[in-house]
Amino acid sequence: MVRRLTSPRLEFEAAAIYEYPEHLRSFLNDLPTRPGVYLFHGESDTMPLYIGKSINIRSRVLSHLRTPDEAAMLRQSRRISWICTAGEIGALLLEARLIKEQQPLFNKRLRRNRQLCALQLNEKRVDVVYAKEVDFSRAPNLFGLFANRRAALQALQTIADEQKLCYGLLGLEPLSRGRACFRSALKRCAGACCGKESHDDHALRLRQSLERLRVVCWPWKGAVALKEQHPEMTQYHIIQNWLWLGAVNSLKEATTLIRAPAGFDHDGYKILCKPLLSGNYEITELDPVNDQQAS
């Protein structure tokens, strides 16, 4: 008797298909092994149950059997759809956009950044500024991206505690002129409030501590195209001021997407900053004249 050996991966996939609800079998058979976004749909035609992304759609969809929460979602699912992309960047960007637009029941909600704020360093003072009032893609000396003012001030307080900076000089608490703050007596402040440390040294240490949180200004005049390739697909991601405007199959189609960005996009910044500045992708700066005409 000859015993056939199968790889653990094949056994897992076979088991996964077997465990899925019977009404989803036909969708599983066609799942691609390419990067992209997948959607689990319930009874509603307008609101998906779940939206996810992966560099291998088939593998990721099959893995949804692992937790009870996902099993509950699968029982409510009626069909599965997917959209292939040229790579991980496109999958991340499309997933973030679709979740915001369609608000799936089983996804963590992505907020639209109505209170998005940052710390702005002005000479020796730190202010909390809001994306709805300041263009975060262009404004200098911004540090950190926070959901609200409280989170921003908590981050500043943490830095002050780590570096023994003065709460009073940072605006975190009132400070009487010429008097040391309470934390200075406890040796939790280096004494910039009472002359033990110069204000210049205090400001320098503050800037150095904030540097790891710096928000990078958009380094181009206008929109750019980032080329992402897969053996079966090439996409050009059109981006302006850290906002993903969409993807096209050729640079000739870029002008169909270029428009004036509608505010700073936190998710776009987090996804795009590293790949755009890494030097690992082909970046084409689009004609500013054409950009203005199309926007």
From Swiss-Prot:
Q: Which CDD domains match?
A: GIY-YIG_UvrC_Cho
A biological process term (GO) from this entry: nucleotide-excision repair
Quote the PROSITE patterns the UniProt record gives.
GIY_YIG (PS50164)
Gene3D superfamilies xrefs? GIY-YIG endonuclease (3.40.1440.10)
Query: Could you tell me one molecular function GO term of this UniProt entry?
Result: nuclease activity
For this UniProt record, the keywords arranged alphabetically read as follows: DNA damage, DNA excision, DNA repair, Excision nuclease, Hydrolase, SOS response
Q: What is its EC number?
A: 3.1.25.-
Domain GIY-YIG span(s) in chain numbering: 33-108
Q: What are the transmembrane regions?
A: none
Record's GO cellular component terms: excinuclease repair complex
What the protein does comes down to: Incises the DNA at the 3' side of a lesion during nucleotide excision repair. Incises the DNA farther away from the lesion than UvrC. Not able to incise the 5' site of a lesion. When a lesion remains because UvrC is not able to induce the 3' incision, Cho incises the DNA. Then UvrC makes the 5' incision. The combined action of Cho and UvrC broadens the substrate range of nucleotide excision repair.
What is this protein's name? Excinuclease cho
| Origin organism lineage | Bacteria, Pseudomonadati, Pseudomonadota, Gammaproteobacteria, Enterobacterales
Gene behind the chain = cho
